[in-house]
Amino acid sequence: MEKIEGIEVHNHKDSSRILNIQLDDEIVKKLIFPFNKFDLTALELKPFTRFTIAKSLDDLTNNKLSKLINSILRDRSTGCFIIGPKNISLKTNDKFLVKLATAVAHLIGVPNHDSMAGKYYARFHVKHEDASDSYLRKAYRNMDLHTDGTYVKEVTDWLVMTKLEEQNVQGGETAMLHLDDWEHCDDLSKDPVGQQDFVWGSPKSKNIDYKVEHPVFSFDKEGRPKISYIDQFPEPKNMEQGNFLQKLSDALEESKNKIITK
């Protein structure tokens, strides 16, 4: 892998599929000025500014960072990276991290509009008490393994997640599972029920006024399985689909090959 000045790249301690990308202090220092040119309101209301800060980030790496992260995402053997400042300081606050996530996202493509937040990104708090209509903001419940974009018409190719702040908590881990490491992938992806169209809806908080239909499993050009699934939103049409979803959920959650990250 080509060395990029100001950036450290190494494999995650628990999985060679995940690459850790750490921005050295000098890179972070040089990002402060171009990032401060736009406040979050400007980024939300003027889409071209998002590409401006993305270019500022890439320019600091001689345009090598964009090539690296795109190669990771497009390689099925990896497909995941964790990026952030090597050292956290007062300057790398929540606004800086939103801008960094924005820059990274726009080195990859154009994010889908988030109907829940009404912006190009969603931001929310996980609190001690929560009365919302999904597991998303509930502090004491595990969210089962899932993919994003199951209930919308837009194609969801990739996902950027950022933890902006953490206070007075324990836990807060993220669980991930690569399909090619999943013990039950071959059996379930080839099950004819998993290739039927399922109805996918969403609760009111998502602000989506339609439902979509698609199978849980499909296959890429090389015949390798792909999955689009979340446990909360499918509406099985019959016993066969309902039992398949239960079997799928159990098989995902019992996997011994999940990777846990903070």
What are the language-model segments listed below?
Residues 62-68:
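Short, solvent-exposed beta-alpha or beta-beta edge segments that form flexible loop/patches at the rim
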Residues 90-93, 169-171:
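Short catalytic/ligand-binding loop motif for oxyanion handling, primarily in non-cytosolic enzymes
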Residues 93-115, 237-255:
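Signature of the catalytic double-stranded beta-helix
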Residues 102-137:
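A gly/proline- and charged-residue-enriched helix-loop-helix capping module
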